[in-house]
C-alpha cells in the first residue's frame, strides 16, 4: 500500500495538465467534491521543500508563537490588575486576546509539527486523532470570527461615545457581557460546518487531516467571506466615517481648552481602535483572497512553489494578527505599559489623572 501511495504521488508530480492531476488526486484521497483549484492545492502540499525554507518557516512561526502567547497573556493580566483599564473598549480587546491565544496554543504547534517533519501526516491516530483533527480545523476560523465581531463591537462603542455621547449608557456592563458572549456563540454556529467536513483519512497506513470540498462547505465558505470580511468592512467604514465627521465638527466649534483636551483623548482612543482594525484586515487580506480562489471551480493554475508561498504568507498573516493587537495596545496606552512594568518589577507605578481620563473614554 505504501508503494502504491508513493507511486501515485510521484505520478502526480510527473504529470502535466490540471485534469490529469485532478483524476489522480480523486483516486489518491477519496471520492469527494473537490474543485480543480483546491485539488491542485492539496497535492502541492506534498511537495518536499528545501531545508533552508523549512528552517525559515520554523523560525518565523516560533517567534510568532512566543510573541503571541506572551503579548496576549500580558493584555489579559494587565486589564485584570488595573482598575482604570476596566472599560468597554478594553474588555473587547481582552476578548480578542483570549481568542488570539488559540493561535499559539493550538494552530501554530500543529503547523510547526507539519513543517518540521516536512509531512502532512496527522501525528495522532484513532478517536483522539479524529477529535484533535476536527477541533484544530474548527478553532482557527472560530478565533478569526470572534476577532472580527470584537472589532465590530469596538467600532460601535467608539461610535456611541463620539456620535451619541448622551446614549453612552446603552452599553451597560450587562449588555457588554451579552455582546462578548455572543461573539463566541456566533463563532461556533458559523464555523460548525468545519466539524462536519473535516475528516481524518488513512492513506498508505498514514493519517491525514483533510477538509472535504462538499457543496455544504463551499456554500458556507461564500457565506463566511461575506459575513466575516465584506459586511464587517463596510459597516466599520460607515461607523468610522460618521465618527470622523463628528470629530471634525466638534473641533471647529470647541473653544475651551479643557474640552479640546477631552476631544483629543477621544481621538487618541479612536486612532488606536482604527489601527487595530486596519492591521487586522491587512493581515487577513491574503488569506481571504486565497479562500475565495479555492472555492472557485476555475482558477489560475499556479505552480506548486507559488501556491505554497502564497498559502504560507496567508497563514503567516493570520498568525500575525495575534501579535499586532498587543503591540498596538502597549504602544498607544500608558496604563498598559505601566501594568507590564508592575508585573515584571513588582512595584506599583499607579496612574495619573491623565490615564484615568484617557481610559474613561476607552483608550
Briefly describe each language-model feature range.
Residues 57-60, 64, 96, 176-183, ...:
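Hydrophobic alpha-helical transmembrane segments of polytopic
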Residues 90, 94-97, 144, 177-181, ...:
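Internal alpha-helical transmembrane segments of multi-pass membrane proteins, especially GPCRs
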Residues 50-62, 89-153, 168:
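Extracellular TM2-ECL1-early TM3 structural module of rhodopsin-like
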Residues 282, 288-292, 309-359:
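Seventh transmembrane helix
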Residues 102, 106-107, 113-119, 139-153, ...:
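Fourth transmembrane helix
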Amino acid at each position: 500500500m505504501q508503494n502504491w501511495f508513493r507511486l501515485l504521488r510521484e505520478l502526480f508530480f510527473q504529470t502535466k495538465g490540471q485534469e490529469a492531476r485532478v483524476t489522480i488526486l480523486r483516486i489518491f484521497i477519496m471520492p469527494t467534491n473537490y474543485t480543480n483549484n483546491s485539488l491542485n492545492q492539496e497535492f502541492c502540499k506534498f511537495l518536499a521543500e528545501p531545508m533552508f525554507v523549512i528552517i525559515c518557516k520554523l523560525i518565523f512561526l516560533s517567534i510568532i508563537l512566543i510573541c503571541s502567547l506572551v503579548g496576549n497573556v500580558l493584555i489579559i493580566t494587565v486589564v485584570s490588575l488595573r482598575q482604570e483599564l476596566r472599560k468597554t473598549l478594553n474588555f473587547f480587546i481582552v476578548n480578542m486576546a483570549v481568542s488570539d491565544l488559540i493561535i499559539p496554543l493550538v494552530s501554530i504547534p500543529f503547523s510547526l509539527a507539519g513543517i518540521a517533519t516536512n509531512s502532512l501526516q496527522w501525528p495522532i491516530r484513532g478517536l483522539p486523532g479524529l477529535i484533535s483533527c476536527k477541533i484544530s480545523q474548527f478553532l482557527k476560523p472560530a478565533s478569526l470570527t470572534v476577532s472580527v465581531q470584537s472589532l465590530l463591537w469596538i467600532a460601535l462603542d467608539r461610535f456611541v461615545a463620539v456620535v451619541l455621547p448622551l446614549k453612552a449608557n446603552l452599553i451597560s456592563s450587562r449588555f457588554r457581557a451579552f455582546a462578548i458572549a455572543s461573539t463566541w456563540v456566533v463563532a461556533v454556529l458559523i464555523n460548525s460546518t468545519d466539524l462536519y467536513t473535516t475528516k481524518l483519512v488513512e492513506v498508505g497506513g498514514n493519517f491525514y487531516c483533510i477538509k472535504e470540498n462538499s457543496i455544504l462547505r463551499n456554500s458556507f465558505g461564500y457565506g463566511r467571506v461575506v459575513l466575516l470580511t465584506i459586511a464587517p468592512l463596510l459597516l466599520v467604514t460607515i461607523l468610522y466615517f460618521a465618527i470622523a465627521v463628528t470629530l471634525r465638527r466638534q473641533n471647529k466649534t470647541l473653544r475651551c481648552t479643557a474640552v479640546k483636551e477631552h476631544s483629543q483623548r477621544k481621538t487618541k482612543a479612536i486612532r488606536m481602535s482604527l489601527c487595530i482594525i486596519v492591521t487586522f484586515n491587512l493581515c487577513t487580506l491574503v488569506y481571504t483572497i486565497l479562500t475565495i480562489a479555492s472555492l472557485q471551480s476555475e482558477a489560475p493554475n499556479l505552480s506548486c512553489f507559488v501556491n505554497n508561498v502564497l498559502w504560507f504568507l496567508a497563514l503567516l498573516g493570520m498568525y500575525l494578527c495575534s501579535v499586532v493587537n498587543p503591540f498596538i495596545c502597549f504602544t498607544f496606552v500608558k496604563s498598559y505599559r505601566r501594568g507590564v512594568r508592575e508585573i515584571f518589577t513588582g512595584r506599583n507605578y499607579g496612574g495619573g489623572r491623565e490615564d484615568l481620563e484617557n481610559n474613561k473614554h476607552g483608550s
